[in-house]
Amino acid sequence: MSEAERLAAGDPTLFAGSTAATALGWLRHSSAYGGPWLSTIEARLPRRHERTLLVGMGGSSSPARMLSRAPFLTVLDTSNPDTIAATEFDGATLIVASKSGTTVEVQTLMAHALVNGVEPEDLVVITDPGTSLAALGDWLGATVILADPHTGGRFSALSPFGLVPALYAGWSVTELAELQDANQLDAGVVERALARAAAVEIVDGVGQLDVGGDPAANGTALWFEQLIAETTGKDGRGIIPVPGAGPGPGPSEILELHLAAAWLARQLGVDPFNQPDVERAKRDVFVRLMPDARDQSTPVAGVASLGAVLDYPGYHTLQVYGPLSAGEQLAPLRAAVAARCGTTTANLGPRYLHSTGQLHKGGPAVGVIQVVLRPASAPRRIQGRGYTFHDLHRAQADADLAALVSVGRPVARVVADTIDEVLAMVAALG
């Protein structure tokens, strides 16, 4: 068999590492989740409200951002207290999406929503079989939809994680069935994917790929950025997804891009389906949320100055911990850093922890500027927790800062009230 035929057949021995044997379910999603499945699911969904909120991170929410047709669906992929304070939960359907069922942002926002107006009968849970989230959803009387456990989050756009939110985002069953038909696995889509991967120039284990838009403000670019960064960025190698002018890929190219990303990882000799460095900061978050740690607020050691990081000769990334509305404001800041430093990417925290965070810590060396915007809202204690959203948001920033320092990344932190203040700091350093 040729390599293309082996890929179409789902041969796990094509890939480095040991995860492929249980991670190739996405190759059959277009058939498994076609018209009959969509019709059955549509009949189960609660439809009491016009507004729908989706709580999810990484691959559990980025497909929804790509497919969303505003204003039908609002995606809350954050722990930012200002965004949460500004969100009206009463009178909305809530979709809670998490493969593992243990994602901290999802758990805390779900708890918050259920005591701030969301009724269990208006709750839709999307998760893998056997998770604690599935059990909780059943106990609450929510609509629980089980996903494919043999598919990683970033490869789940054509599964329930992408399709169910799309049904709330203006797509009809017929339109989604046609989308699945356009993404059927055949020889043509495999050949196009291999050609797309072959077109990416890779030098010493590093390449760049235009994602066709600004991931901080464009849902399709955000989805594509995660797919490339998390699939390839490990073992010191990786493809850097860079903002582009567009047009980006369309929904009919989802399977082709899944295949191309996996093949790029094969060319780099890395496991396409693991994300070893994503867990690095997650573990430290919970340590920092312990009462003693919150009270001490110990600074992260080893942090560099802004000037030193701007002088770093490699590529740069901006990690901005602020409200979701700040995503629209990142382009001028990214452009200012790029004018001085060259290739620069930017996105919001903690969103990036579930996507490009793998690339930042596991991929090619990068200069990191972490921006923390001071929340304007009053602290809000999370239902059933001993900490607030302010505590969680800052703990996530601190944990990733420490993780970046621990792997030798040059990283600076800037604390400010607005993006304009940060722009002024960059300008002052010439």
Describe every region a protein language model picked out.
Residues M1-D11, P291:
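Gly/serine-rich nucleotide phosphate-binding loop at the start of the catalytic core
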Residues W139-G141, R340, V407:
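Short, structured coil segments at secondary-structure junctions
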Residues P63, S156-P160, F224, E256-A260, ...:
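Catalytic-loop motifs flanking and including active-site residues across diverse enzymes
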Residues I126, G130-A142, N347, L353-K361, ...:
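Glycine-rich, charge-decorated loop segments at or immediately adjacent to ligand/cofactor-binding or catalytic sites
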Residues F15-H49, R65-L67, W171-T174, L185-R280, ...:
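Acidic catalytic cores of enzymes that act on phosphate-bearing nucleotides/polynucleotides
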Residues P46-A187, P247-G248:
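Glycine-rich phosphate-binding loops that contact phosphosugars or nucleotide phosphates
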Residues Y312-P313, T317-L318, A346-P350, H390, ...:
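C-terminal amphipathic alpha-helical interaction region
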Residues V75-T78, P120-D128, L146-G152, T231-G246, ...:
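A generic structural motif
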